[in-house]
Swiss-Prot record:
Its EC number is 3.1.-.-. The gene is rexB. It comes from the Bacteria. GO terms for molecular function: 5'-3' exonuclease activity; ATP binding; double-stranded DNA binding; helicase activity; hydrolase activity, acting on acid anhydrides. Belongs to the helicase family. AddB/RexB type 2 subfamily. The heterodimer acts as both an ATP-dependent DNA helicase and an ATP-dependent, dual-direction single-stranded exonuclease. Recognizes the chi site generating a DNA molecule suitable for the initiation of homologous recombination. This subunit has 5' -> 3' nuclease activity but not helicase activity. Heterodimer of AddA and RexB. This is ATP-dependent helicase/deoxyribonuclease subunit B. It holds the Pfam family ADDB_N. Its cofactor is Mg(2+).
């Protein structure tokens, strides 16, 4: 064995490549070994350093791959054992054990996390060269007993199913020990680069290779200063020193110092020396030179999105200077936090990249389909799960519009559960759903699912066959092929499909002869799919590489950007969580030779120093270290390592927000520039100098010219929220000449509430989602129907009998039966409505001096100027003197307010009066009023009553009164009825003024509607808060930003309020 060390300013790879070339020139076969995470980059680097740029004598690979070169022909043809297969084996083993067999873990038998921990422990035992019987000295002896039962049973299953229990390295080591590879190894030289420690498995293999190979050469970075130190605790080279010292002591070799021809920039060397001096308690009498600062940059950004954008702009600048994407490396401090954002931003700047991390399959449509299938079976056909299956695009041949219509209907009819899905859809609504088509679609969905879900407990092989038959019926494979939109997606789908078929094969192999329920089968497949990962190799090598910063090696790329280096992630604190604690692992390690657990938490300090050292030397030309103060909406501090660099004299540059400028980095990429122009066009203008304004004026003029060629535009507006008028063609279609504009009191109220809301409801005809479950609209229909029946009953039956008959016959109507007898909740609503009817009905019995002459009266009121107002009057009453009035039933409290009416928000009563005036017989000229009747079950606070007497009854009937607007002429006739006339009496002239102003409101609204320009103007009564419908989800209206667009209501003081509003009405309606 030969041990080599060198300073960070030299290239260890070049030194080891020279050693490899010498061995190859002598006729030896050379294996150049790199860590798993670095083998791809190391292979490219080694080939670059070879003069011939390639050779068959030097193979750059990993330990695992190297073993296959020697054992591929002699290895037994057994089944491959991966993590998913292991999990299934442990699940089967736990199925065969009873809870009482496992005192410590009996309650966790079906816990997926526990099974994952078993898989991790089993893999650790293999890497550590340990068996489950070596787990002595645990905190609880029962833990070892349980683990022995579980793992031994799992290993028995592996033997029965012919799975290979040995790892590739174990098989390689066994072959070496048996002397099967002596001839080949005698002509082999092994060169090892990039390691600072070996696992127990690698350590044991290394000892065998050292005894049988021609030579083993290992290199590591250690400074000569550190190598000569006797005390190395806390030294930045502590990990490498321990690594070399352990090998030197074990193999009785003295490491040698070597140098390379290639010497990197002295700026990095000087920074490394300062970093070393800080941690080995020595001092230096010099500082970084001014020229050294050109190779380092420390950035601080406010948010991670801005941080990534700054990096993207800098990369574009490097390309402008002539560098390639492959010259750039981006390192992430927090892979999970940055992974989702860095892709879209790099795509915006058109930067091709390769993310050096396996992607989880959990977000793939196939996994979502399997998960929805499993949940549909487990939760008895829940609607959300069925719809998720359809939306995955993998179930059957349904268009998106068909799925949307199916979803809309199932939500309306509340279809959920197998019973409802299995029955034909018969319920319809005013929207007239295409039931024939929906039932055909229902059958195409239900029949294959029903055939699969009715499977009883049976052999696993039979379940897999039925599942495959189901997947064929729904054309899963064909739909999977149709998902891909690009070559990259094709490759991803192929990897996911291969993983899916492997999982099915493993399940068939392990559970083929075991009896299982379908739910267990689907749960196991779902778990395997969700935990699986896949990789896609980039189509070209000229890409920006992105990976975690702790996987970096020295001198990786000319330009390195390390971002997200906060205190929480740099350094990383690794804590193991599993079935064994670190203390238990340490006790086991004390008594084993060549066999030991890796305890990551025990090596945090020296590993972090080693990572920081590699990071500070990762670039050969320029290193950018960046930190964001906010990551995932959480504030974080600077890394202590970055604080050390600041003490060395490196300035911390606050990059700030990404304001637009005319630097090359801002305008050098068309796609990024366009996105920023759009962004700035949507926000308030920032302050600019005259030079900036001139520059952007010219740029915008040029950009608009280019956009016009592509029929695109950048809209400009004086307000944050604005709307466009409808085109003449649309106006002619929506409001054709010669055809009256149809309005109603409700439509007029919506218009004056918010014009844009009128546009949505009455021009676009957008409706809210319907539901078969009773809502306020259906409750109102029920109450109206009961009172309509009651008032039509002119028999001599007692009033209470009439009321009972009205309730009974209304409940028997098919529509109300369908609505109120569907479930217990609907039945409870019906009971409440019946109580309301019984509580409100007595008011009708008390008013014996009125006669109901009509109910549910449809009308059409001609307002002139091609305006037709339509509606339904709930009830028309006639007093004893022949005067007429209208009653409008309300399920909530309402009363006429002249100010609300003036502002157009309460035109209903006056509209009904105008209609009644038009349809009333010619011999009846007098109207006594228009009123609301609140249908309610009055609630009284008994604490306010001193005793139970007539005052209690009076309070109940006081709540049951007619409230509205009444004629002063009819005051005497109204005084004997349940009419609340206080502050509600108007003279005939005043009533005429109200009617004329009501007509004016309609004419004014119609004129504006026919122009086709609808404003976003919800009303405000005080100028501080907005009471109108803001429609935030559609308009993005924000009261604090858009108060200027709200319509301010006219409000007057309570004193003389009536007279003042009447005066305003006369002026505006030209009276």
């Amino acid at each position: 064995m030969k041990l080599i060390y060198t300073e960070m300013s030299y290239s260890m790879t070049e030194i080891l490549v020279n050693e490899a070339r010498k061995a190859a020139d002598q006729g030896y076969r050379v294996f150049y070994i790199a860590p798993n995470s670095l083998s791809f980059e190391k292979e490219r680097e080694v080939l670059t350093l070879l003069p011939e740029r390639g050779t068959f004598s030097i193979i750059v690979t990993r330990f695992v791959q190297m073993s296959r070169y020697f054992t591929v022909e002699s290895s037994p043809s057994k089944q491959h054992l991966d993590d998913t297969t292991l999990a299934m084996i442990f699940y089967r083993a736990l199925m065969q054990l009873k809870p009482e067999d496992l005192p410590s873990y009996g309650r966790l038998q079906n816990n997926s996390v526990f099974i994952e921990q078993l898989v991790e422990l089993y893999k650790e035992l293999k890497n550590a060269q340990l068996s489950v019987h070596d787990l002595t000295g645990l905190d609880h002896p029962q833990k070892q007993e349980d683990l022995i039962k579980i793992i031994e049973l799992a290993e028995t299953i592996m033997i029965q199913q012919d799975y290979n229990q040995d790892s590739p390295l174990q098989s390689f080591a066994r072959a070496i020990k048996l002397g099967l590879l002596n001839n080949q190894l005698s002509k082999t030289v092994v060169v090892i680069d990039g390691f600072s420690r070996f696992s127990a498995e690698e350590d044991y293999l290394l000892s065998l290779l050292n005894n049988n190979c021609q030579e083993v050469i290992i290199g590591s970075y250690v400074s000569q200063k550190a190598y000569q130190k006797s005390f190395i605790k806390g030294n930045i080279y502590e990990a490498s020193l321990h690594f070399l010292q352990d090998l030197a002591q074990k193999y009785h070799i003295k490491p040698v110092f070597a140098t390379s021809n290639q010497v990197f920039k002295p700026a990095f060397s000087r920074l490394t020396q300062l970093f070393e001096a800080t941690h080995d308690f020595s001092q230096v009498d010099w500082q970084l030179q001014k020229s050294d600062l050109d190779h380092f940059s420390l950035w601080q950004c406010h948010h991670q999105k801005e941080e990534i954008e700054h990096v993207a702009k800098s990369i574009r600048q490097k390309l402008y200077e002539g560098y390639r994407y492959k010259d750039i490396l981006v390192l992430l401090g927090d892979m999970d936090a940055y992974q989702l954002q860095i892709g879209p931003i790099f795509d915006k700047f058109e930067i091709p990249y390769y993310l050096g991390k396996a992607e989880p399959m959990a977000a793939h449509p196939l996994v979502q389909f399997i998960e929805s299938l499993e949940r549909s079976q487990r939760y008895n056909w829940r609607r959300e799960d069925i719809l998720n299956m359809l939306k995955s695009g993998l179930f059957g041949c349904f268009d998106d519009s068909d799925i949307d219509r199916f979803e809309e209907y199932t939500q309306f009819a509340d279809i959920k559960g197998f019973t409802k899905f299995s029955k034909p859809f018969t319920i319809n609504s005013s929207r007239q759903y295409p039931l024939d088509f929906l039932n055909e679609m229902r059958q195409d969905i239900v029949l294959p699912l029903q055939e699969l879900f009715k499977s009883q407990k049976q052999l696993g092989a039979s379940l897999v066959d039925k599942l495959i038959l189901f997947l064929k019926k729904i054309r899963l494979a064909e739909n999977m092929q149709g998902l891909a939109q690009s070559q990259l997606e094709v490759e991803k789908n192929e990897e996911v499909w291969k993983r899916f078929t492997d999982i099915l094969t493993s399940f068939h192999h392990i559970f083929g002869q075991e009896k299982l329920r379908l739910s267990d089968c689907l749960a196991l497949i779902k778990t395997g799919m969700k935990s699986a990962q896949y990789r896609v190799v980039p189509a070209t090598l000229d890409v920006v590489t992105i990976k975690s910063y702790d996987l970096v090696q020295p001198h990786s790329k000319p330009f390195v950007y390390a971002i997200g280096l906060t205190q929480s992630h740099f350094p990383k604190q690794i804590h193991h969580s599993g079935l064994l604690s670190d203390q238990e692992r340490a006790r086991i390690n004390e008594i084993r030779n060549y066999r030991h657990f890796d305890i990551a938490s025990a090596e945090n300090s020296k590993k972090n120093h080693q990572t920081a050292l590699s990071l500070f030397n990762a670039a050969t030309k320029e290193l950018v270290l960046s930190v964001s103060t906010v990551i995932n909406e959480t504030f974080d501090d600077l890394s202590p390592y970055l604080k050390e660099l600041i003490n060395f004299g490196l300035p911390l540059l606050d990059k700030g927000k990404n304001y637009l400028s005319y630097d090359n980095s801002d305008i050098g990429n068309y796609k990024a520039l366009l996105s920023q122009i759009i962004a700035i066009n949507r926000q308030d203008l920032i302050e600019m100098s005259d030079q900036d304004k001139m520059f952007w004026t010219v740029v915008l003029r040029y950009l608009r010219k280019q956009l016009r060629k592509q029929q695109l535009e950048l809209p400009t507006s004086d307000y944050r929220l604005s709307t466009k008028p409808l085109s003449k063609e649309v106006i002619e279609v929506c409001f054709p000449k010669g055809i009256p504009l149809k309005l109603s009191a409700t439509a007029l109220t919506v218009f004056y509430n918010n014009q844009y809301n009128y546009f949505l409801k009455y021009v676009l005809n957008l409706n809210k989602t319907e539901s078969i479950h009773p809502d306020s609209r259906i409750h109102g229909q029920y109450l109206h129907r009961v009172f309509e029946r009651l008032m039509k009953d002119h028999t001599q039956e007692p009033f209470d009998n009439k009321l009972k008959q009205a309730i009974y016959h209304t409940n028997q109507e098919s529509f109300f039966q369908q609505v109120y007898q569907d479930n217990a909740e609907a039945e409870y609503s019906l009971a409440i409505l019946e109580d309301i009817v019984r509580s409100t009905a007595p008011i009708l019995q008390l008013n014996q001096n009125i006669q109901v002459i009509d109910q549910e009266k449809n009308f059409q009121l001609d307002m002139g100027n091609e305006i037709l107002v339509h509606g339904i009057i709930d009830r028309i009453d006639q007093l004893s003197d022949g005067s007429l009035g209208i009653v409008d039933y309300k399920s909530s409290a309402n009363q006429f307010d002249i100010g609300t009416f003036y502002n157009g928000l309460s035109p209903q009563l006056m509209t009904y009066l105008a209609a009644l005036k038009q349809i009333a017989p010619h011999d009846i000229n007098q109207l006594f009023g228009a009123m609301y009747l609140h249908l309610q079950d009055p609630k009284l606070d008994l604490v306010t009553f001193k005793q139970i007497d007539n005052t209690l009854v009076e309070s109940i009937y006081k709540a049951l009164t007619y409230k509205g607007i009444f004629s002063e002429v009819e005051k005497e006739h109204l005084s004997t009825g349940a009419y609340q006339t206080k502050n509600a009496l108007y003279s005939n002239d005043e009533l005429e003024t109200l009617l004329n102003y009501n007509k004016y409101l309609y004419l004014k609204a119609a004129k504006h509607i026919k122009k086709g320009h609808f404003l976003i103007n919800p009303y405000t009564s005080d100028g501080k808060t907005v009471q109108g419908d803001q429609l935030k989800a559609i308009t993005r209206f924000e009261a604090d930003l858009d108060m200027g667009q709200a319509r301010r209501l006219v409000t007057l003081p309570a004193k003389e309020k009536k007279e003042c509003f009447l005066t305003l009405m006369r002026k505006e309606s030209h009276l």
